[in-house]
């Protein structure tokens, strides 16, 4: 610390000496102040260039645009040199803080068209880390948000802004901690609205730029209410009544719709409409895209896809499956094709996957040179997969806009690509009509039978061996049929024309699963716009609610005017309610249809009000107190009590022996207290709910095995006496024993018993050990006796320890009749070694001499 202070003091003195040289010398400015002045001058110059910029007829380089040096450097390092048409048209007015509504074909570079103005606006505003949130980009899918974030990181790496992703898939608390440090936020609408509503301290009032990327897709996914709420949170601030608001809004999409125009009116201020498409060619196809379609029966679509994959093993393609809970169908195709080993890397992507899995698949497919991605429409918008050769639409798209965005994953910017759509025979005419309305030319091709696969037997084997594949097939079948059923354009999607049995058989299923389709009103016929349909639905709901309220009031008034009904009517109401509950549990269509018809017939003569099953459920009364027959019984008892006195006396259970017995006041008070206590005890002993208070359903449930087990007492443990065999309760006997003696006495008695048992057991163990020792000694003596007998015998010796000549001479005859005696010399040698070395040596010499003599005599 001292050294640092000394150095600082010397530097200050030197600066002071330098500053005092000469009479007219000016004080020196600090380096950071000079830097700040330089930056301010650059910003002023840049702002004047932006305000006075007149775009030329054609912009060929990014350097021609009035942008900061940091942005120019980031574009150059990312190899972005030449702007696309949408970029050259949208960036100049966006730099001047104009609201933009842009539309261009897929793959035309709309992302840079809003990222560059976003960075420049914050740079001109001198936005810093302490200023909070300055720009928000809203994307329809997580993958598109991640791609936008990576693009922003590449071109804005020389700026000092902090950017972040809020797309879900992570705990909300972690994202809340990062929100306060972000200058640029890229988010999906659902999670962003959740943070705007629930995160404390999330200030969104200072936002300068709001971007809606792929806005039509946001509306298709049902995010219109969320977008309206988000726009209301980011409300622009106007300095004067006629001035431009401080917030700039950029809205980009490949296609336009009426809902998009309504959203533009809500969020944009005097927007500038920019479109790179020719008049009447909204959403035109890329120039290098080749489009084909083939007509294949529904049951042969997987065969056609398999044949296509086997004939294009070096391609990079995307297979789109119709959305609408189609994650199961994507999984079914992926799992079955994976087991067939196509020779091409397979991947699958859908909205039900976890966020890390989706990002991993997105990155792996982007970096692959040849692969096949099976996905839903989650990958149909905005995602820029490099070098995609083929886009195969296994199912018919929902509409032409979806078709445009799907095929836009290939032929990006100036590259070439091919799109193939596989249609059912019933979908061809309707889809050709829709293509003609958009001036899109799609050529028809015919797939040869030899080029198609035959997967029927393989699918059946998979479904038979693996229950998971069978289950996936069933769910895929149901989800596909339901997705066709809910489509709006019934001129294309005709569920009655689909061969359900053949389709199920092609997936390896033994038969078509039973499907419970919703009401036909849910599948609207092509006609009115979405706004008109929504208004009509809201009016119908309001009318139904009013009719239900009026009907319930009328019914209550009728009940009050008519009085109490009969017992039979109440039982019928209860039976109807039980039938409704049973039908809800079973879920059968036939019963529910019959009941609704009966309800309609019964409701026509009574009243025009609509009474649902929930209304009847809430109208049910307690069977023991509020029912008419119970109140009638109470009134009847009161009449009898008022009219006939002696009859009641005959029916009484308890009769008074003496009525003329007079008691004193104290005795009367005592007897009243005793009787009151007895009555209270009797009432307390009674159950709170009796069988009369319960409904038939409750009584039936109580009579079941499960209900009886609940009401019955639990099992008791019983011990039987060893001497008498008498049964006694386990816990009761334990309590009795505890009462008889204390714990110390019990321990003492227990230890004495155990000592006696151990003494007896010790004696037994000693006897057993003694017997074992005797047996071992007896066996050893018997073995020694056998060895002595063998030594004294005249059996021939098995082996010679002499020269080889004797051994070779004796090879011809066998001296040992059996190999058993060969073990005896070893045993004998061991015994002699135990006895001593000298005796063993003498014995061996005598034996050898005797053997040699015997051999010489024999020869």
UniProtKB/Swiss-Prot annotation:
<dbReference type="InterPro" id="IPR014014">
    <property type="entry name" value="RNA_helicase_DEAD_Q_motif"/>
</dbReference>
<feature type="domain" description="Helicase C-terminal">
    <location>
        <begin position="288"/>
        <end position="463"/>
    </location>
</feature>
<dbReference type="GO" id="GO:0005524">
    <property type="term" value="F:ATP binding"/>
</dbReference>
<dbReference type="InterPro" id="IPR011545">
    <property type="entry name" value="DEAD/DEAH_box_helicase_dom"/>
</dbReference>
<feature type="compositionally biased region" description="Acidic residues">
    <location>
        <begin position="540"/>
        <end position="600"/>
    </location>
</feature>
<keyword id="KW-0698">rRNA processing</keyword>
<keyword id="KW-0547">Nucleotide-binding</keyword>
<dbReference type="InterPro" id="IPR025313">
    <property type="entry name" value="SPB4-like_CTE"/>
</dbReference>
<dbReference type="GO" id="GO:0042802">
    <property type="term" value="F:identical protein binding"/>
</dbReference>
<feature type="region of interest" description="Disordered">
    <location>
        <begin position="771"/>
        <end position="859"/>
    </location>
</feature>
<keyword id="KW-0694">RNA-binding</keyword>
<dbReference type="InterPro" id="IPR014001">
    <property type="entry name" value="Helicase_ATP-bd"/>
</dbReference>
<dbReference type="GO" id="GO:0032040">
    <property type="term" value="C:small-subunit processome"/>
</dbReference>
<feature type="domain" description="Helicase ATP-binding">
    <location>
        <begin position="91"/>
        <end position="274"/>
    </location>
</feature>
<comment type="similarity">
    <text>Belongs to the DEAD box helicase family. DDX10/DBP4 subfamily.</text>
</comment>
<keyword id="KW-0347">Helicase</keyword>
<feature type="binding site">
    <location>
        <begin position="104"/>
        <end position="111"/>
    </location>
    <ligand>
        <name>ATP</name>
    </ligand>
</feature>
<keyword id="KW-0539">Nucleus</keyword>
<dbReference type="InterPro" id="IPR001650">
    <property type="entry name" value="Helicase_C-like"/>
</dbReference>
<feature type="compositionally biased region" description="Polar residues">
    <location>
        <begin position="7"/>
        <end position="17"/>
    </location>
</feature>
<dbReference type="GO" id="GO:0003724">
    <property type="term" value="F:RNA helicase activity"/>
</dbReference>
<keyword id="KW-0067">ATP-binding</keyword>
<dbReference type="GO" id="GO:0003723">
    <property type="term" value="F:RNA binding"/>
</dbReference>
<dbReference type="Pfam" id="PF00271">
    <property type="entry name" value="Helicase_C"/>
</dbReference>
<comment type="subunit">
    <text>Interacts with the U3 and U14 snoRNAs. Associates with pre-ribosomal complexes.</text>
</comment>
<feature type="compositionally biased region" description="Basic and acidic residues">
    <location>
        <begin position="528"/>
        <end position="539"/>
    </location>
</feature>
<dbReference type="Pfam" id="PF13959">
    <property type="entry name" value="CTE_SPB4"/>
</dbReference>
<dbReference type="InterPro" id="IPR027417">
    <property type="entry name" value="P-loop_NTPase"/>
</dbReference>
<dbReference type="Pfam" id="PF00270">
    <property type="entry name" value="DEAD"/>
</dbReference>
<dbReference type="GO" id="GO:0006364">
    <property type="term" value="P:rRNA processing"/>
</dbReference>
<dbReference type="InterPro" id="IPR000629">
    <property type="entry name" value="RNA-helicase_DEAD-box_CS"/>
</dbReference>
<feature type="short sequence motif" description="Q motif">
    <location>
        <begin position="60"/>
        <end position="88"/>
    </location>
</feature>
<feature type="compositionally biased region" description="Low complexity">
    <location>
        <begin position="814"/>
        <end position="823"/>
    </location>
</feature>
<feature type="region of interest" description="Disordered">
    <location>
        <begin position="512"/>
        <end position="615"/>
    </location>
</feature>
<comment type="function">
    <text>ATP-dependent RNA helicase required for ribosome biogenesis. Involved in the release of U14 snoRNA in pre-ribosomal complexes. Required for pre-rRNA cleavage at site A2.</text>
</comment>
<feature type="short sequence motif" description="DEAD box">
    <location>
        <begin position="213"/>
        <end position="216"/>
    </location>
</feature>
<protein>
    <recommendedName>
        <fullName>ATP-dependent RNA helicase DBP4</fullName>
        <ecNumber>3.6.4.13</ecNumber>
    </recommendedName>
</protein>
<dbReference type="GO" id="GO:0016887">
    <property type="term" value="F:ATP hydrolysis activity"/>
</dbReference>
<keyword id="KW-0690">Ribosome biogenesis</keyword>
<dbReference type="GO" id="GO:0005730">
    <property type="term" value="C:nucleolus"/>
</dbReference>
<keyword id="KW-0378">Hydrolase</keyword>
<feature type="region of interest" description="Disordered">
    <location>
        <begin position="1"/>
        <end position="34"/>
    </location>
</feature>
């Amino acid at each position: 610390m001292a050294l640092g202070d000394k150095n600082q003091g010397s530097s200050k003195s030197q600066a002071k000496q330098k500053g005092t040289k000469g009479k007219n010398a000016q004080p020196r400015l600090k380096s950071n102040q000079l830097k700040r002045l330089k930056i301010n001058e650059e910003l002023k110059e840049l702002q004047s260039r932006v305000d006075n910029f007149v775009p030329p007829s054609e912009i060929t380089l990014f350097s021609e645009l009035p942008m900061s040096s940091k942005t120019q450097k980031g574009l150059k390092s990312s190899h972005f040199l030449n702007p696309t048409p949408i970029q050259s048209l949208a960036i100049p007015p966006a730099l001047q803080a104009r609201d933009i509504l842009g539309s261009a074909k897929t793959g035309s570079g709309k992302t840079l068209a809003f990222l560059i103005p976003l960075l420049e606006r914050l740079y001109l505003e001198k936005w810093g880390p302490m200023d909070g949130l300055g720009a928000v980009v809203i994307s329809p899918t997580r993958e598109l948000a991640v791609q936008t974030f990576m693009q922003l990181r590449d071109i804005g790496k020389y700026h000092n802004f902090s950017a972040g992703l809020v797309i879900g898939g992570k705990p909300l608390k972690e994202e809340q901690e990062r929100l306060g440090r972000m200058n640029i936020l890229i988010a999906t609408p659902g999670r962003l609205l959740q943070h705007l509503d629930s995160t404390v301290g999330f200030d969104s009032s200072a936002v300068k730029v709001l971007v809606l990327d792929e806005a039509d897709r946001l509306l298709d996914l049902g995010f219109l209410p969320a977008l309206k709420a988000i726009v209301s949170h980011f409300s622009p601030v106007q300095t004067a009544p006629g001035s431009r608001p401080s917030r700039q809004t950029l809205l980009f999409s490949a296609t336009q719709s009426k809902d998009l125009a309504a959203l533009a009116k809500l969020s944009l201020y005097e927007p500038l409409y920019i479109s790179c498409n020719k008049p009447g060619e909204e959403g035109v196809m890329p120039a290098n895209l080749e489009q084909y379609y083939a007509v294949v029966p529904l049951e042969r679509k997987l065969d056609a896809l398999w044949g296509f994959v086997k004939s294009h093993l070096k391609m990079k393609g995307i297979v789109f499956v119709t959305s609408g809970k189609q994650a199961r169908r994507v999984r079914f195709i992926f799992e079955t094709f994976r087991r067939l080993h196509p020779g091409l890397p397979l991947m699958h992507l859908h909205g039900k996957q976890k966020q890390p899995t989706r990002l991993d698949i997105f990155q792996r497919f982007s970096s692959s040179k040849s692969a096949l991605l099976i996905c839903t429409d989650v990958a149909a918008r905005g995602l820029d997969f490099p070098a995609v050769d083929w886009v195969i639409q296994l199912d018919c798209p929902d509409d032409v806009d979806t078709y445009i965005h799907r095929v836009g994953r290939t032929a990006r910017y100036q590259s070439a690509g091919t799109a193939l759509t596989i249609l059912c025979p019933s979908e061809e005419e309707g889809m050709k009509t829709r293509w003609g309305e958009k001036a899109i030319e799609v050529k028809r091709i015919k797939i040869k039978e030899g080029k198609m696969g035959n997967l029927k037997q393989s699918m059946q084997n998979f479904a038979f061996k693996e229950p998971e594949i069978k289950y996936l097939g069933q769910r895929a079948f149901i989800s596909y049929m339901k997705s066709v059923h809910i489509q709006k354009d019934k001129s294309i999607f005709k569920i009655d024309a689909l061969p359900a049995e053949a389709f199920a058989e092609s997936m390896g299923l033994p038969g078509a699963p039973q499907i419970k389709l919703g009401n036909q009103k849910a599948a609207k016929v092509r006609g009115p716009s979405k706004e008109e349909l929504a208004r009509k639905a809201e009016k119908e709901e309001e009318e139904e609610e009013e009719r239900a309220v009026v009907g319930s009031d009328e019914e209550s008034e009728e009940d009050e005017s008519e009085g109490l009904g009969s017992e039979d009517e109440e039982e019928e109401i209860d039976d109807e309610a039980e039938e409704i509950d049973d039908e809800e549990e079973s879920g059968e269509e036939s019963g529910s249809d019959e009941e609704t018809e009966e309800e309609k017939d019964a409701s026509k003569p009574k009243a025009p009000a609509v009474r649902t099953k929930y209304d009847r459920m809430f109208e049910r009364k307690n069977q023991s107190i509020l029912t008419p027959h119970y109140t009638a019984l109470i009134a009847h008892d009161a009449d009898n009590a008022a009219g006939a006195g002696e009859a009641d006396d005959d029916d009484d259970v308890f009769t008074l022996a003496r009525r003329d017995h007079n008691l004193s006041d104290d005795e009367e008070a005592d007897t009243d207290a005793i009787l009151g206590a007895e009555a209270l005890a009797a009432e307390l002993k009674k159950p709170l709910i009796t069988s009369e208070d319960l409904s038939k359903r409750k009584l039936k449930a109580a009579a079941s095995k499960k209900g009886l087990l609940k009401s019955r007492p639990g099992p008791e443990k019983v011990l039987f006496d060893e001497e008498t065999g008498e049964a006694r309760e386990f816990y009761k006997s334990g309590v009795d024993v505890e009462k008889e003696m204390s714990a110390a006495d019990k321990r003492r008695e227990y230890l004495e018993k155990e000592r006696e048992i151990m003494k007896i057991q010790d004696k037994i163990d000693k006897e057993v050990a003694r017997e074992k020792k005797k047996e071992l000694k007896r066996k050893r003596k018997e073995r020694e006796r056998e060895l002595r007998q063998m030594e004294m015998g005249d059996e021939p010796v098995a082996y010679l320890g002499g020269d080889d000549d004797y051994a070779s001479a004796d090879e011809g005859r066998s001296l040992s009749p059996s190999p058993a005696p060969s073990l005896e010399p070893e045993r004998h040698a061991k015994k002699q070694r135990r006895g001593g070395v000298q005796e063993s040596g003498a014995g061996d010499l005598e034996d050898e001499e005797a053997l040699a003599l015997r051999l010489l005599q024999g020869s």
